[in-house]
Design a protein with these regions (language model features):
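Well-ordered alpha/beta subsegment
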Residues: 112-144
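Glycine-rich active-site loops that engage anionic ligands at enzyme catalytic sites
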Residues: 62-118
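Serine/threonine-rich low-complexity intrinsically disordered regions
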Residues: 52, 102, 108, 132-135
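Electropositive, beta-rich accessory/interaction domains or terminal extensions
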Residues: 1-77, 81, 86-87, 136-144
Length: 144
């Protein structure tokens, strides 16, 4: 896992340079997103003060969003628009990565999978904008 300050989100693909962006166009798991609050909960579940986010193998870390409540909703980060599609369940690798109980500590806190709807540059510090139901589709209609 490589940590970067900015990335290009490519519609229907993934993040430029990420292994998933090379696969089939329109893949169901283009990027993964986890919240800082989830990372803190995982650390607490393991009795730790801190866990390095890159250990969890998610593409983006955000804060202030209730990710699990945003199924099929749209968000904008930087210039890119994403649709959150499904919960991102932790894999069995988490027991070896985080230690015994790592997988169990992540249950319910794995974050979300998302599709990239509009390409754009994203970078650390970008505001995450929630696009309420209807607003993204309305914006598309205006642009056409």
């Amino acid at each position: 896992m490589r940590v970067v300050e900015q990335a290009l989100a490519i519609a229907d693909r993934g993040l430029q340079g990420d292994r998933r962006a090379v696969g089939s166009k329109g893949a169901a798991r283009q990027i993964t997103i986890i919240s800082d609050e989830f990372i803190q909960s995982i650390a607490e579940n393991l009795g730790r003060e801190f866990i390095s986010p890159d250990l969890l193998r998610r593409n983006l870390v955000v804060s202030g969003l209730k990710l699990n409540a945003l199924h099929y909703q749209y968000i904008q980060i930087g210039d890119a628009v994403f649709q959150l599609t499904a919960k991102c369940h932790p894999c069995s690798r988490m027991d070896s990565t985080l230690g015994e109980g790592g997988l169990a500590a992540m249950l319910g806190y794995g974050g979300m999978c998302a599709n990239i709807i509009e390409s754009g540059k994203i970078q650390c510090g970008d505001t995450v904008l929630y696009l309420p139901p209807g607003t993204y589709q309305d914006r598309q209609m205006i642009l056409c």
